[in-house]
């Protein structure tokens, strides 16, 4: 098991919080484009292409989160229609070829679907390690819906109680860990997912919850992110909250949780 994957699993298990590693982690030179699903507006597409280096920047797409056979082609068409001229989607049947393509990519993109399915497809390929290194070295990594959820180290799986704020009701798995300071939720307002993100933040109070609504993106550059798009992003911060100890299955309770509601043009910095 690689050190990268081992650290993600420790974070997911609650045994190691981001910011507590033995040696300081360098600030990534790249950017994340984290979209809440529901379509990707032109303003987000254009910004992503700009961050990647312009229309000729090489873009690779991993569509394995989706069960639809044409997801890769649809994503390629989306980026071409936005002005990109060098874009292709990658199968994982040849892991070495996929790793090589990522090595030369300026932008890596994940369409929607099921985030657990994508992470399962990556197992044993070595591709996540290359993506992580490319992000640290300056590449742009983006995704929408399920492709946004995988940015976290502690990744929402979709298995949750949306009707209550209950200890242990929101299930997680290990994500790519590209944005380990936060837990990303997607379709956040449109699908009324606030309860599951609050539940998870109270269980992992050292990590900030970022709920991104549809047709909206967080553009992450180092510790800072900014909002572009059409709707809102909710930031739920329990790092200084007074959390009541409760057993699994009980109603979660806390005081002094900080809530930020951000829209296009706004941003903030998250530091541990």
Predicted stretch roles:
Residues 23-55, 66-74, 79-81, 156-157, ...:
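C-terminal and late-domain segments of enzyme folds
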Residues 66-107, 112, 117:
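Portal/gating segments that form or line small-molecule/metal binding sites
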């Amino acid at each position: 098991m690689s050190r990268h994957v081992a650290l993600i699993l420790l974070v997911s298990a609650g045994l190691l919080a981001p910011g507590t590693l033995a040696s300081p982690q360098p600030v990534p030179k790249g950017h994340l484009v984290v979209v809440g699903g529901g379509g990707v507006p032109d303003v987000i597409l254009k910004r992503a292409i700009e961050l990647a280096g312009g229309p000729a920047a090489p873009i690779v797409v991993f569509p394995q989160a989706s069960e639809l056979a044409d997801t890769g082609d649809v994503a390629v068409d989306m980026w071409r229609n936005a002005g990109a001229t060098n874009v292709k989607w990658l199968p994982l049947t040849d892991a070495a070829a996929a790793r090589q393509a990522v090595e030369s990519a300026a932008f890596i993109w994940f369409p929607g679907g099921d985030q657990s399915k994508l992470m399962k497809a990556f197992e044993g390929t070595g591709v996540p390690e290359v993506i992580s290194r490319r992000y640290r070295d300056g590449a742009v990594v983006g995704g929408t819906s399920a492709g946004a959820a995988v940015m976290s180290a502690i990744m929402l799986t979709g298995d949750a109680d949306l009707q209550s704020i209950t200890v242990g009701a929101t299930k997680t798995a290990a994500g790519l860990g590209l944005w380990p300071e936060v837990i990303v939720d997607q379709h956040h307002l449109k699908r009324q997912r606030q309860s599951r993100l609050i539940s998870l933040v109270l269980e992992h109070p050292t990590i900030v919850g970022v709920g991104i609504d549809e047709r909206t993106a967080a553009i992450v550059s180092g510790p800072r992110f900014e909002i572009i798009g059409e709707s809102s992003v909710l930031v739920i911060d329990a790092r200084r909250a007074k959390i009541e100890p409760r057993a699994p299955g009980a109603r979660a309770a806390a005081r002094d949780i900080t809530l930020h509601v951000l829209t296009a043009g706004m941003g903030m910095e998250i530091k541990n």
